[in-house]
């Protein structure tokens, strides 16, 4: 097989970005947004989507100009060994944190709804072990997993939300800015984590067949997930009210569980949601897991990118961290902290780009 055939196409890149963004938020976003008491979470999602698209379009030219290198390599070249090491370590720890958060949510949902008699530790370990297997297979194999799962997920989710629309009441999402602007902007930290995922572009650019299309792929990927989350939140709140959504652990599942469609013999629509979401949530972990793998390979200068010791250590570390939170309240608290860590992560390309610009000005530039 020719080398070019292993490169990611525009559509594969777009699907990877969208799939990594769409995960736990499908089930937990309505509750997180409802905790502020504002029914305008869907507007905050749209606003955040626009903000993050602008941020990405600002730092992508730096990655495009050096499309043969991941951000991990750029950090080491521009910032030097020590600072580059710290930056790369932070990104890796962040990616691992995201994987653990996603894996714990996956374990909680599967254990509660699908495998009630199976210990959650067993469920989590199996999913992490399968994920590590895919991580060892490389970026292209992960892209193929995304390509199979994402379209099915999108179609089934949209169909279920359309069926739910018959329960929608406009009064439940009004007034739009109830509680004033302070209440509206208090939504920002609550919904921040659900935009984590597009950072996989830090390492994806060198794997693209045509890096010139990266801006379009990432912008459309973020836009797709933004619309998906906004519609999900709008319909769930519009069917359940804010007061009910914040008292239910998994509002989306509760809504679909209560769904009845006349003329259709299917009674448990929530099973379709749970099964497709489980596959999507698993796929969502892969992008961040691979990011941590590539970063650690760079940090430890490993020639064998599929080093068995590294993959085993990653599996063990993520498993124990995933099982550390005592309950769901702890999980959601750590999720909020990850949201703030996400803000720091997306400043790193700007910091390295600024250092590179200074080096060029003083005649020590090593990059384009």
From Swiss-Prot:
InterPro entries: Spore_GerAB (IPR004761). It comes from the Bacteria. Pfam families: Spore_permease. GO terms for biological process: amino acid transport; spore germination. It is a multi-pass membrane protein. GO terms for cellular component: plasma membrane. PANTHER family: SPORE GERMINATION PROTEIN A2. Belongs to the amino acid-polyamine-organocation (APC) superfamily. Spore germination protein (SGP) (TC 2.A.3.9) family. Involved in the response to the germinative mixture of L-asparagine, glucose, fructose and potassium ions (AGFK). Could be an amino acid transporter. Cannot stimulate germination in the absence of gerD and gerK gene products (fructose and glucose receptors, respectively). This is Spore germination protein B2. The lineage of its organism: Bacteria, Bacillati, Bacillota, Bacilli, Bacillales.
């Amino acid at each position: 097989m020719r080398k070019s055939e292993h490169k990611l196409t525009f559509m594969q890149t777009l699907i990877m970005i969208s799939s990594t963004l769409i995960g736990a938020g499908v089930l937990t976003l309505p509750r997180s947004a409802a905790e502020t008491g504002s029914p305008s979470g869907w507007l905050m999602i749209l606003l955040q989507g626009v903000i993050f698209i602008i941020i990405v379009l600002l730092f992508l030219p730096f990655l495009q100009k050096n499309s043969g290198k991941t951000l991990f390599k750029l950090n080491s070249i521009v910032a030097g060994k020590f600072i580059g090491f710290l930056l790369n370590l932070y990104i890796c720890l962040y990616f691992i944190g995201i994987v653990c958060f996603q894996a714990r949510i996956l374990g909680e949902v599967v254990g509660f709804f699908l495998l009630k008699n199976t210990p959650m530790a067993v469920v989590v370990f199996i999913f992490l072990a399968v994920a590590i297997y895919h991580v060892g297979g490389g970026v292209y194999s992960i892209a193929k997993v995304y390509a199979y799962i994402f379209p099915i997920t999108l179609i089934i989710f949209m169909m279920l939300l359309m069926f739910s629309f018959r329960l929608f009441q406009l009064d439940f999402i009004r007034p739009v800015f109830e509680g004033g602007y302070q209440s509206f902007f208090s939504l920002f930290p609550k919904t921040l984590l659900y935009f984590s995922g597009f950072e996989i572009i830090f390492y994806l650019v060198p794997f693209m067949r045509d890096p010139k299309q990266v801006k379009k792929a990432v912008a459309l990927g973020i836009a797709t997930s933004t619309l998906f989350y906004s519609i999900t939140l709008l319909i769930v709140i519009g069917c359940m009210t804010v007061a009910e959504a914040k008292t239910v652990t998994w509002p989306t599942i509760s809504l679909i569980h209560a769904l009845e469609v006349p003329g259709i013999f299917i009674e448990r629509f929530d099973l379709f949601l749970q099964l497709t979401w489980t596959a999507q949530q698993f796929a969502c972990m892969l992008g961040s897991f691979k990011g941590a793998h590539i970063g650690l390979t760079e940090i430890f200068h490993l020639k064998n990118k599929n080093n068995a010791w590294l993959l085993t250590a990653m599996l063990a570390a993520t498993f124990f961290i995933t099982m550390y939170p005592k309950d769901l309240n702890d999980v959601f608290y750590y999720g909020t902290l990850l949201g703030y860590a996400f803000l720091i992560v997306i400043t790193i390309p700007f910091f390295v780009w600024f250092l590179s610009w200074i080096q060029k000005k003083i005649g020590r530039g090593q990059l384009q």
